[in-house]
Amino acid sequence: MADIEELKFDAEVGKVLSLVVHSLYTNKDIFLRELLSNASDACDKLRHEFLSNHDLMEEGEELKVVISVDKDSKQLSICDNGIGMNRDELIANLGTIASSGTQRFLEALGGDKAKGYDLIGKFGVGFYSVFMVASEVVVDTCRAGESVGYRWRSSGDGGFTIEKLGEDVPRGTKITLTLKEDESGFLDKFRIEHVVTTYSDHLGYPVYFLDEKGEEEKLNSGIAIWTKPKAEVTAAEHLEFFRSVAHIGSEPWMVIHNKNEGAIEYTNLLYIPSVKPFDLFHPDRRCSVKLYVNRVFITEDNVQIIPQYLRFIRGVIDSSDLPLNISRETLQNNRIVEKIKTSVTKKVLSALKEKAESDHESYSKFWENFGPVLKEGLCEAMDTESREGVLSVCKFHTSACAAGELVSLADYISRMKPGQESIFYLSGDDLESTKRSPQIEKLVSSGIEVILLVDPVDDFWTSVVSEYKGVPFKSVMRVGEKDLEKCIGASDDSGDKTSEDSGESASDKESIGSFIEYLKKVLDGVVSDVRVSKKLTTSLVCLAVPDNSMDIRMERFLREQKQLNYKGNRILEINIDHPIAKSLLKEHEARGESELLNGIVHLLYDEACIIEGEEIRSTVDFASRINGVLAKIFSSK
């Protein structure tokens, strides 16, 4: 008798098994879909390895999957003649899961059973769905090119055994399930056929049912739907294929199906989901488009067939111009792959632009899901044409937009005021507070539209993208007097002028000048400059930065990430028409410098910092100054 090794599942697999068996699925048909998908992958891998080793199979041999049942023993078997597994692969594939992946799966599930359908396939745990219906699972397998087979057996109770078989085990894998008492329905041929045609009809390999007479009946069409003419692919076929490649239970938001017959021949069948994939913001930023060569699966790992900022796309790209024996390593810098990537990217951006122009409501939902990811592309190295292609499909909230409304850059430029030379934008933590920021008061009151940026990625792309269609971007934090004069002088009919613009007397100007110099003296070493604000109308103070300085939010992020160890220059702007500013000016005229007034000046700077989300220098000093002002107020009553 052959030696039998008794092994334990790793700890996280045990948790997954418990979820799968007791609570995860409401649709148990899924286990068969998972097994058929695995069998198809095994055939794909054999075909790929056969390209470099013709001893692995006979030339022209049919790769297939065969389903059979034994009603007396209550056993269901799924057999493929694909790549097979050796002992180490059995343990690696069926005994362990990468702990990080499993933990993410468990955290993602978070007690919500309904999420299981969408998440199970993403973390390599689909095989374990067999234990929903099986009391015992036996896997007999032999690796292509090897002569020794192995048997893996488990009841899903925490462990498994590995047994070495003889040398007459056929290449491939046979999975035999002993079904639970109440799962005998899966022995019915018609139910099996329904599951196959529902979930696996698109597989590139025939799936047969072996009847009692030993005859094989084909259950699936075996058609790769991306090879069919675009007009002949039905909505039902798209839905089925999308769910199989995306592991998402919803419908696709957009289908992009093209056959390119130019200098490079390829077919793409791509789907944009209507919901966010779970792994959208995974640190690896992995893309999930499968690369085929003449219907032979090559890889979906370690190759950037689409840019990372389009990683929400699912589907396949099939090319006849790549060699069948291309290795995954040489794909990295392959000229044809790069050309396909460039071409596909243009097709996707073109489709998005057309959708954005024709269906604003639908596109707004897409943008809510994937806008931040798409904007990541603006941070990547690309030529001007490519960057403008991404910018052309971007949508933004602005100071002039109603709730939920988005505008394109083309829309914004078409609404620019006479004399306005820049696309004004302001970054903030959230839409509501950014829309109320003191920074944009004068611009908004003068009818100048400001783009409001609230995604973390916005601070990055605005530091590398300087213009769109020849119109420069300019942060409101850097807007100065000249910028305002150019655009507001032609568009401001409100009569809202500052004291310096309203014909104040020479003595008034002198008093204001003296007061500003006083503020500079008190805040020397704290700010690089103090100036009368031209962009405040109702607020007292705000911060600004010099033209060539980094935006405050970006600088703060880099400091938090320990990538920056200094604080850039700040400019304090004060609204000299504000009642408090007027009172401080009078106090300075009447009494000059005082300890109380000095404290209030520091409070003005602290207020400006708080508005911008900046840390104040000393909470102790801040509290002391507040108390000093309050004491003065109440002692005078």
From Swiss-Prot:
Q: Kindly give the InterPro entries that the UniProt entry links to this protein.
A: HATPase_C_sf (IPR036890), Heat_shock_protein_90_CS (IPR019805), HSP90_C (IPR037196), Hsp90_fam (IPR001404), Hsp90_N (IPR020575), Ribosomal_Su5_D2-typ_SF (IPR020568)
- Give the span(s) annotated as C: 557-637
Q: What does this protein do?
A: Molecular chaperone. Has ATPase activity.
Q: Which cellular compartments is it found in?
A: Cytoplasm
Q: Where is the composition biased (Basic and acidic residues)?
A: 494-508
Q: What is its main location?
A: cytoplasm
- Gene Ontology MF, one: ATP binding
Quote the NCBIfam families the UniProt record gives: PRK05218.1
Indicate the family of this protein.
Belongs to the heat shock protein 90 family.
The keyword Chaperone belongs to this UniProt entry's keyword annotation = yes
SUPFAM superfamilies per UniProt: ATPase domain of HSP90 chaperone/DNA topoisomerase II/histidine kinase, HSP90 C-terminal domain, Ribosomal protein S5 domain 2-like
What protein am I looking at?
Answer: Chaperone protein HtpG
Q: Does the keyword Lipid biosynthesis apply?
A: no
Outline the segment boundaries, as ranges, of region: B: 329-556
GO cellular component, alphabetical, reads:
cytoplasm
Q: How does it assemble?
A: Homodimer.
**A, as annotated region:** 1-328
Segments carrying the region annotation (Disordered) are 488-508
